[in-house]
Curated annotation (Swiss-Prot):
<dbReference type="GO" id="GO:0006886">
    <property type="term" value="P:intracellular protein transport"/>
</dbReference>
<dbReference type="GO" id="GO:0032456">
    <property type="term" value="P:endocytic recycling"/>
</dbReference>
<dbReference type="InterPro" id="IPR028934">
    <property type="entry name" value="Vps26-related"/>
</dbReference>
<dbReference type="InterPro" id="IPR014756">
    <property type="entry name" value="Ig_E-set"/>
</dbReference>
<dbReference type="Pfam" id="PF03643">
    <property type="entry name" value="Vps26"/>
</dbReference>
<keyword id="KW-0967">Endosome</keyword>
<comment type="subunit">
    <text>Component of the commander complex that is essential for endosomal recycling of transmembrane cargos; the commander complex is composed of the CCC subcomplex and the retriever subcomplex. Component of the heterotrimeric retriever complex consisting of VPS26C, VPS29 and VPS35L; within the complex interacts with VPS35L. Interacts with SNX17 (via C-terminus); the interaction is direct and associates SNX17 with the retriever complex. Interacts with SNX31; the interaction is direct.</text>
</comment>
<comment type="similarity">
    <text>Belongs to the VPS26 family.</text>
</comment>
<protein>
    <recommendedName>
        <fullName>Vacuolar protein sorting-associated protein 26C</fullName>
    </recommendedName>
</protein>
<dbReference type="InterPro" id="IPR014752">
    <property type="entry name" value="Arrestin-like_C"/>
</dbReference>
<comment type="function">
    <text>Component of the commander complex that is essential for endosomal recycling of transmembrane cargos; the commander complex is composed of the CCC subcomplex and the retriever subcomplex. Component of the retriever complex, which is a heterotrimeric complex related to retromer cargo-selective complex (CSC) and essential for retromer-independent retrieval and recycling of numerous cargos such as integrin alpha-5/beta-1 (ITGA5:ITGB1). The recruitment of the retriever complex to the endosomal membrane involves CCC and WASH complexes.</text>
</comment>
<dbReference type="GO" id="GO:0005768">
    <property type="term" value="C:endosome"/>
</dbReference>
Length: 297
């Protein structure tokens, strides 16, 4: 075994909030004593924006504004050049999570075109003959709970061929009537999206009913903006020809890291929507879209 470098964060779930202190230890393990040129630790939080393929070309001028946005950056020298004994050495560290000026610690979010990530990177410099060692570890930031009282916003819906937006498809569709409700389109991110759906009537047999959670990411600047919708998850809530008049429960948990409270800044936006998708025989697809507002309380 050579020399191994590891970062251990004190909290098992690695979740922190603005104003708290991130603490842990850097662990150096080696069979023999290790000569080194210093050990440093860097904490960094960045927003990485990326353009989709369909936007590239339209926004060449736009490349300049898509460089990573730095939220927080801090560096400490943990150990000056010297030697570590054989065995295991633990070096404690603490970083206060404070941002400078008017910057905000956005919530950790792993998207397709918007990525908000916080990392710790430990570097051990060594002599020319030995390779430098680096270890990176991600920690998670949750945004502050929203101020004010949370008020749910229930939505009742009726889906028929007449309510669909595409008029050409409308004429080709068999007759159907679906009713239902979502208990709230204002959603607490730690609680499931709930509601119910009832198939009142349908001339064609139903193949499947699905719930599709969609992220809508917008990257923008003075030259224009790119808005892209991509699927996060798809859940089947009914399989086969659903009994008419039967209440089908709608229940969807928001996945951690892939969702965050709805976010709007000058450079980017992260929004969420849910689609109720009904597949009819032989090959008809019916989609009803509901914008969601996610928050943390």
């Amino acid at each position: 075994m050579g020399t191994a470098l590891d970062i251990k964060i004190k909290r098992a779930n690695k979740v922190y909030h603005a104003g708290e202190v991130l603490s842990g230890v850097v662990v150096i393990s080696s069979k023999d004593s290790v000569q080194h040129q210093g050990v440093s630790l860097t904490m960094e939080g960045t927003v990485n924006l990326q353009l989709s393929a369909k936007s590239v070309g339209v926004f060449e001028a736009f490349y300049n504004s898509v460089k990573p946005i730095q939220i927080i950056n801090s560096n400490i020298e943990m150990v000056k050049p010297g030697k570590f004994p054989s065995g295991k050495t633990e070096i404690p560290f603490e970083f206060p999570l404070h941002v400078k000026g008017n910057k905000v610690l956005y919530e950790t979010y792993h998207g397709v075109f918007v990525n908000i990530q916080y990392t710790l990177r430990c570097d051990m410099k060594r002599s020319l003959l030995a390779k430098d060692l680096t270890k990176t570890c991600e920690f998670i930031v949750h945004s502050a709970p929203q101020k004010g009282k949370f008020s749910p916003s229930p939505v009742h819906f009726t889906i028929t061929p007449e309510t669909l937006q595409n008029a050409r498809e409308r004429a080709l569709l068999p007759k159907f009537l679906l009713r239902g409700h979502l208990n709230s389109t204002n959603c607490v991110i730690t609680q499931p999206l709930t509601g119910e759906l009832v198939v009142e009537s349908s001339e064609a047999a139903i193949r499947s009913v699905e719930l599709q959670l969609v992220r809508v990411e917008t990257c923008g600047c003075a030259e224009g903006y790119a808005r892209d919708a991509t699927e996060i998850q798809n859940i089947q809530i009914a399989d086969g020809d659903v009994c008419r008049g039967l209440s089908v429960p709608i229940y969807m948990v928001f996945p951690r890291l892939f969702t965050c409270p709805t976010l709007e800044t000058t450079n980017f936006k992260v929004e969420f929507e849910v689609n109720i998708v009904v597949l009819l025989h032989p090959d008809h697809l019916i989609t009803e879209n509901f914008p969601l507002k996610l928050c943390r309380i």
